[in-house]
Amino acid sequence: MAGPLHDSGARPIDSKGILDWLIMETRDQRFIDNIFVDLCERLVQAGVPLARATLHFRIHHPQWLGARILWRKGLTEADIRMFDYGVEDTTQYLNSPLYAVNNGASQVRKNLEAATDDEVPNSLYEELRADGFTDYVALPLEHTLGKRHVVTFASDRKGGFETVHLEVLTSLLPVLALVSEIRLKNRMARTLLETYVGPHASEQILAGATTRGSGVTVSAAILICDLRDFTKLSDLWPRDDVIELLNGYFDAMSEPIERHGGEILKFMGDGLLAIFPLSNPRACENLLQAIGEAEVAIATLNQENLARGREALGYGIGVNVGDVMYGNIGSRRRLDFTVIGPAVNIASRLENLTKQAKRPVLLSRAFVELAGRTRDMEHLGAFPVKGLDDPIDVFAFSSGTAQAAE
């Protein structure tokens, strides 16, 4: 741009200074919401009558279709809202400027100072008008490979935006698109890693722990869970019913684990492996509480299954504690971030023993003693297990369930 732009009051607008800042001084800022707030405040200081702005992104997340980042005058932090899958099928979205821009419109502009007779009812415009906004514009934010997102700007100035104000805003969009795409892809990479390997493992991978054999030793309480008779169910039930069954079962098991500070490292067919690092002094207690809540969730799920004419789900849980190697295991080109070690093997053997012992949860002596729960448990005796020379002491909840033992 050759020089400063001027509004009708002949005030210079230093759009080049804002552009230079956006290019050169945001590299160390990790989050796009912070950059967006700073950008909006700089635009206001430069003389653009901006009172509200939003960024709308489609994101790759197992729970959310998209995210909206909102700034408005007076806010020092952005307001972030997530949107469920299915929102794009709603009448509200289909009548919105977001729909128009996402489907090819180069701009949607709305004078909010006066409603017209032919105006299509729109809750967004009505809300903005009620809040004193006078002008609104929605513009595409073009990312690479044809991915289109949306940015909107609103003014509360009488008469709304002048042409020069819109020129300033549109001149920033190519750079804002690049800056936002980098942050969005970083967030997507982090989200995908967290989805598939868990938050702790994803942090290590993003920090560079990607070579085969790299890892750390972690002291942790270990939980291994397995669904009973899954092979039979998968043979008898339709595929979609089997997937629904597994998702319900994993929700019932995993949500209490994560709620109490555990990390699920792996889903293994119809089973899962989770750890509770002993860096948290309540790790063992948290694990027991997670099992208790999972038992309740599974019981509720079984009631629903029985009401639908399905069989109740059985499960087995093995619990141990000890040092485990936590890191990259695999071939030269395909790695898995997981835990290995004798303590994991014992937890797995305990889970297998639940069938023989006819108890849904079995715990090792090492775990029970560390948790200080020896009096709450029933000692079932020493059991020989495959791969170990000596039998292992096995405990179960004397009351039958973790929930009753609390």
Predicted regions and their residues:
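Regulatory loop-to-helix N-cap segments in sensory/regulatory domains
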Residues: 2, 154-170, 339
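Helix-loop-beta substructure at the N-terminus of cytosolic sensory domains
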Residues: 12, 28-70, 74-76, 260
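Short hydrophobic beta-strand micro-motif common in sensory/regulatory domains
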Residues: 134-143
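Catalytic NTP-binding/metal-coordinating core of nucleotidyl cyclase/transferase enzymes
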Residues: 211-289
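Short helix/loop segment flanking the catalytic signature motif in cyclic-nucleotide metabolism enzymes
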Residues: 235-238, 267-313, 319, 338-346
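Cytosolic regulatory/linker segments at or just downstream of nucleotide-handling modules
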Residues: 354-406
